[in-house]
């Protein structure tokens, strides 16, 4: 899938190409795992084409490696779509409110991700109940909007109702998964590939130099 495009904004050397190819292989393995998880939780999942709530309000943390791969996707977009993305970045930047600023992803065009195959880890894992290394659970915000897990989500307690799970006859219990990038980076196949993730920033921070 990797297509190297020369541009004024980024130059890719042999080592970077190797890293990006390894990252692409990593994504194939990761997707296999995530797809199985979504399949296990399919009774509670409402994700479908045209559903873009997760792309409409977020901060989108990206490692440097993830961003470089995303940038390849951007470089291969038709010129008219590139212009729309750049306009989105400029518009979001004008609205920027500092740390913890929630915004629409600039790559969301007409309700669809314009760089879907190149999207980051946060985009691939959203929609599931997650658990960090300290055991803290996070239920996807779309549960409050009548989507994933909403059938068994108690808005008053902000928790999953085991009573509703049983009462409604679900076959499996909702499960939480540690899908943080920090955890994913430690998976055996990730370590074996020797990926250099680089620093982590919010997506908007990575993108701003390209409109200056």
Positions of PLM-derived features:
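Short loop/turn segments that flank or connect secondary-structure elements
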Residues: 1-53, 57-58, 62-212
């Amino acid at each position: 899938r990797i297509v190297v495009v020369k541009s004024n904004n980024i130059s890719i050397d042999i080592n970077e190409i190797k890293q990006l190819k390894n990252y692409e292989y990593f994504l194939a393995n990761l997707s296999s795992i995530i797809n199985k998880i979504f399949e296990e939780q399919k009774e509670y999942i409402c994700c479908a084409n045209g559903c873009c709530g997760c792309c409409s309000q977020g901060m989108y943390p990206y490692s440097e490696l993830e961003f470089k791969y995303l940038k390849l996707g951007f470089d291969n977009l038709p010129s008219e779509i590139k212009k729309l993305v750049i306009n989105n970045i400029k518009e979001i930047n004008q609205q920027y409110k500092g740390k913890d600023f929630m915004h629409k992803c600039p790559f969301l065009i007409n309700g669809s991700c314009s760089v879907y195959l190149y999207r980051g880890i946060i985009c691939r894992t959203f929609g599931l109940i997650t658990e960090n290394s300290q055991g803290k659970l996070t239920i996807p915000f779309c549960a409050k909007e009548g989507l994933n897990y909403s059938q068994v989500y108690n808005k008053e307690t902000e928790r999953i109702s085991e009573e509703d799970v049983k009462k409604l006859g679900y076959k499996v219990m909702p499960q939480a998964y540690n899908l943080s990038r920090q955890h994913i980076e430690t998976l055996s196949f990730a370590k074996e590939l020797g990926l250099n993730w680089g620093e982590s920033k919010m997506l908007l921070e990575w993108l701003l130099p390209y409109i200056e």
